[in-house]
Amino acid sequence: EKAYKELGTVTAIMAGCVILAVLPNAQNMYAQWDLGQNSIRGATELTTTTPSGEKISSGLDKDYAFAWSYGKGELLTLLVPNAYGGSSGGMLGPDSELYKELRAKGAQVGKEVQAPTYWGEKTFTSGPVYFGALVCFLFVLGMFVIRNPLKWWLFGGSVFLILLALGRNFDSFNDFMFHYLPMYNKFRTVEMALVIPGMVFPIIAIWGLKEVLSETVSDALLKKGLIAALA
């Protein structure tokens, strides 16, 4: 009975927090919802057929929604920002080979030259999603030294959202999610799902660092975490 009482109390507190968080933004949220009903993300009187043969009557079609799917290899940019070249309009300085070649050919260039440095599979991009090398290092360390089981909920949620960001690059999973996960077919780009892991990683990183600095972590566990983080 005590456990049920505690569960009820925690649930009530969480529900109250959700309500308090929503109320200040209720007007903006309603305006966004109302606008969405009359946009390409809303319902339509017509049923359209996508190039892949899928029939839709509400939300974005799958081909359009998955156009900016994050590549599996591109997940490396979470750790190394320019692993896939950067952006479609990157700036190259005098030290780059392209800049030197343009100057050698007599091209009029300034201190920098703009060029499509991105070489991933998206049509174009303004830049990669980057969490930070230090944050990623501390995140892995934190997963080892944090003893609170809450870390697994944060980790699992992050993995789930990263999989959503892959879009068509993990189609066996995301095809189901596109049709049955509420609001997923209304995302501007599926890679926007990386926003939440981008906040969770620093939380785990700081939490883990706190555990280390509090000197409550055994040397063996700390060593194991450091080896995994460096790997």
Regions from the PLM with identified roles:
Residues K2-V10, K100-V113, L138-R168, V217-I227:
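Membrane-interface helix-loop-helix junctions at transmembrane boundaries of multi-pass membrane enzymes
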Residues K5-W33, T48-I56, V159-F160, K224-A231:
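Hydrophobic alpha-helical membrane-interfacial segments at the cytosolic entry of transmembrane helices
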Residues P116-V129, F160-V200, L213:
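Membrane-helix boundary/interfacial segments in multi-pass membrane proteins
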Residues K5-I13, C17-V22, D61-F66, S126-V129, ...:
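Hydrophobic alpha-helical scaffolding
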Residues Q27-G142:
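Periplasmic/ER-lumenal interhelical loops and adjacent helix-loop junctions
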Residues G36-I40, T44, R147, L181, ...:
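Membrane-interfacial segments
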Residues C136-M143, F201-L213:
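Transmembrane alpha-helical segments
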Residues V18-N28, S69-S88, W152-L166, A228-A231:
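Hydrophobic alpha-helical membrane-insertion segments
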